Structure formats: structure tokens, C-alpha cells
């Protein structure tokens, strides 16, 4: 089904109870329901947002269009967790219900500040001429998970510097100062990251510090979802450069999710990642995008990704549902590369162990399992997973020890 702009931007209150019931019934018929991953009950899930720790709980939000597997009028769903494995949904909490976000509550981030969880997100406004104006908006979540929006934008767009592609604010604290990164397209149609600081850490008063300097390469035509985190004493920038030239880094997705590791983050006369290394793919898989990462109160760094891509269709679409989030990944640096590991609590999901030898030609009929592979002799090994009966369709993974 092709969705028109009018259908995508219907207001939420225009849907009846019967509409919602029909959506749920169809989604329940999907054979693609996951066992471990966060997914929507109906409609579209895309970017993870507001990943944070507050009031003794892990908090996570995701962008949501409840009414179909398309990018329509976005809102945020809120979840909380005690262990980063089991998440409990509190509900849809951030609606596109003001003049500043009447065309969608887009991506953003969160920071525990004083006695609340502070949210900053992009609100898309469209008028009768359908011209987009992106505002960076604020909200607070209290200890009872009640959300209240700020009435006025925190950061206004400056169209002398950027186009209307100006979104995905990431708020973070560094050396006692609160900063914000925003992905953008420059007025020259290049991908850039804008840097702001909260004046005297007042979260309603922001100063534009200019662009973040982290590479001499051209970063495509737009940067989405920038995140700056601190891992093992290094500064790590995770971001999504749309239109990146593949001569810079090879990638197979429509849009890549990249990272760079630097020695330090500095501001002042120059806003830069000092001695930033090469761009590296965050994930070599087919569907990993819009990764959101943050530093927990103890300094540990965690990340979670959308397992999906814009402008892509999936088998679940026929059931009016699309998108899941990755499992939470704990981050570390080894040999100047970013390593991503499942959190320790994932081990508690393990059940019966089964040892398989290639010589036995074992067949696993379940699609829910953890696979550990031990190969001692070969320099290269090819695994075929989820192979069909004919053997002509599979997920093939090549492990090359020599080239790592």
C-alpha cells in the first residue's frame, strides 16, 4: 500500500478505537515476532531516543508511528529497565501536539539533571505551504514518569548556516559543562555537526559554538544522529553520514553508521576531536542505523541501534508493523577499534547448552539461539545460517582470522 502525505500526517485523534483494534489484530498475525528485541505492537519503530539512567532505572524511548509501517507523524514511546535486558513499556508519552512539532516529534536524547530527566528533541513544524522548520524542543520527565513539555523552543534554526535538515540533538556533560551536538546539512549542502553549550548549564539557554571539526573528508550531504561518548579515556563520535563517498569508507547499507576515535574533545578557539582516527563502520550488517550511545553515571558506555533503514521495505510490512531495536551493547576500545559486547545480564537468558560438530551435520530448527563458534585450524571459515531446505538461500558469514 502506498501512503499519501495526507495519510501519513493524520492526527492521532482522528483514528477510531476500531481502527486501532484492526491494526492490533493484523500485527498479531505476523510470523516475524521477535523474542528478545524491542518492537512496536503496531506501526513503525525507528530511532532509539533518550537512552539514559535516571532515578535508579535505565530509560529508553523510540520514535513511533503507530498506524502503519511508514514514516508518518512521529511520537515517542517510553520504556524503563532494571537490567538493560528486560524493558517495560510505560506508554506513548511524547505526542506531536504543539505548533512546534505538529509534523512530528523526531529524534533526541536525555540527561538526568537535578530532579528530573531532561529531554531534548527535534520538533518538525510545517505550515500550510508545507515548508519544514525544525526546532530543538525540550521536555522533562519526573520520578513518576510524567512528562511535561517546555512551551518554547530551546534552539532555533539558523538558515544562514544550515538548510531545514537540522535535527537529532545529543545532550552530554563533559568536564562539568553541558553540551549538545546536532546533525545538519550546511547551506552548501554538506554534512556537518553543530556544537552548542548550555550557558552556565542553563538548559533553556544555549550558545552556538560552531561546527565540530573531526575529519578532513567531506561527510556526504547530511549527518544524522551524532553521539559523542567517552570510552576508556578516549573520545568516540558515533554518527550517520548520508551520501558519504564510498572511496572514503566502503559500506553496503543505503546510509552508513560510522564512528571515529579521538584522543580528546576540545572547545574554545577550536571545537575539535583531537587526533581523530579514520572512519570505521560501526556494524558490517545490513540493518544498523541511528545508533544512540551514552555514558552511564559510572562512566561505562552503552549503545543501542535501530535494526532498520530509511526508505526500505521489510516482510513485516504486510502486517502493518516494522522495525526492532538491537540489544544493548557495552562499549570498549581495543587495538584502536570500538568493541561492542552484550551486557552481562544477557547471560541469564541462557538455557540448555547444545554442542554441535560440523562432522555431525546437525540442523537447528529454532531461530532463537546464541551461537559460539570455535575454529582452531582454519584461517578462514564460512558459516551459513538460516539456510533453506534447498540450500540456495542463507545468511552467510565469513570469518577471516588473517585479515581480522
Question: Where are these predicted regions, by residue range?
Answer:
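Structural secondary-structure packing elements that flank or coincide with functional cores
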Residues: 296-297
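Substrate-binding/catalytic groove segments of enzymes
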Residues: 300
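Beta-rich carbohydrate-recognition and catalytic domains
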Residues: 1-103, 107, 111-168, 173-219, ...
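Repeated scaffold domains used in trafficking and secretory/extracellular systems
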Residues: 224-226, 289-291
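Secretory/extracellular carbohydrate-interaction modules
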Residues: 347-404
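Short, surface-exposed beta-strand/loop micro-motifs that present aromatic residues
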Residues: 49, 291-293
Amino acid at each position: 500500500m502506498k501512503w499519501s502525505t495526507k495519510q501519513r500526517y493524520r492526527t492521532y485523534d482522528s483514528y477510531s478505537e476500531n481502527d486501532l483494534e484492526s491494526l492490533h489484530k493484523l500485527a498479531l498475525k505476523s510470523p516475524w515476532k521477535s523474542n528478545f528485541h524491542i518492537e512496536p505492537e503496531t506501526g513503525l519503530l525507528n530511532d532509539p531516543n533518550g537512552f539514559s539512567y535516571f532515578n535508579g532505572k535505565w530509560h529508553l524511548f523510540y520514535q513511533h508511528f503507530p498506524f502503519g509501517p511508514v514514516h508518518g507523524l512521529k511520537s515517542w514511546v517510553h520504556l524503563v529497565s532494571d537490567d538493560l535486558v528486560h524493558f517495560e513499556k510505560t506508554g506513548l508519552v511524547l505526542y506531536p501536539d504543539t505548533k512546534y512539532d505538529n509534523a512530528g516529534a523526531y529524534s533526541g536524547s536525555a540527561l538526568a539533571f537535578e530532579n528530573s530527566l531532561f529531554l531534548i528533541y527535534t520538533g518538525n513544524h510545517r505550515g500550510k505551504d508545507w515548508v519544514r522548520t525544525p526546532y530543538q524542543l525540550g521536555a522533562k520527565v519526573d520520578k513518576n514518569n510524567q512528562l511535561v513539555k517546555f512551551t518554547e523552543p530551546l534552539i532555533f534554526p539558523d538558515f544562514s548556516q544550515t538548510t531545514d535538515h537540522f535535527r537529532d540533538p545529543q545532550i552530554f556533560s563533559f568536564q562539568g559543562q553541558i553540551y549538545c551536538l546536532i546533525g545538519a546539512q550546511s547551506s552548501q549542502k554538506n554534512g556537518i555537526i553543530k556544537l552548542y553549550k548550555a550557558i552556565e548549564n542553563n538548559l533553556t539557554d544555549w550558545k552556538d559554538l560552531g561546527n565540530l571539526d573531526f575529519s578532513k573528508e567531506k561527510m556526504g550531504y547530511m549527518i544524522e544522529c551524532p553521539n559523542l561518548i567517552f570510552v576508556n579515556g578516549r573520545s568516540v563520535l558515533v554518527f550517520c553520514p548520508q551520501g558519504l563517498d564510498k572511496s572514503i569508507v566502503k559500506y553496503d547499507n543505503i546510509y552508513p553508521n560510522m564512528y571515529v576515535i579521538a584522543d580528546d574533545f576540545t572547545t574554545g578557539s577550536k571545537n575539535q576531536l583531537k587526533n581523530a582516527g579514520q572512519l570505521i563502520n560501526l556494524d558490517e550488517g545490513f540493518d544498523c542505523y541511528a545508533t544512540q550511545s551514552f555514558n552511564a553515571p559510572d562512566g561505562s558506555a552503552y549503545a543501542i541501534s535501530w535494526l532498520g533503514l530509511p526508505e526500505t521495505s521489510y516482510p513485516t510490512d504486510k502486517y502493518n508493523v516494522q522495525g526492532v531495536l538491537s540489544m544493548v551493547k557495552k562499549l570498549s576500545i581495543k587495538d584502536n577499534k570500538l568493541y561492542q559486547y552484550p551486557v552481562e545480564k544477557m547471560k541469564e537468558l541462557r538455557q540448555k547448552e547444545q554442542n554441535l560438530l560440523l562432522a555431525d551435520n546437525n540442523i537447528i530448527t529454532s531461530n532463537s539461539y546464541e551461537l559460539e563458534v570455535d575454529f582452531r585450524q582454519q584461517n578462514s571459515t564460512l558459516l551459513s545460517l538460516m539456510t533453506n531446505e534447498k540450500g540456495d538461500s542463507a545468511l552467510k558469514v565469513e570469518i577471516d582470522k588473517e585479515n581480522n
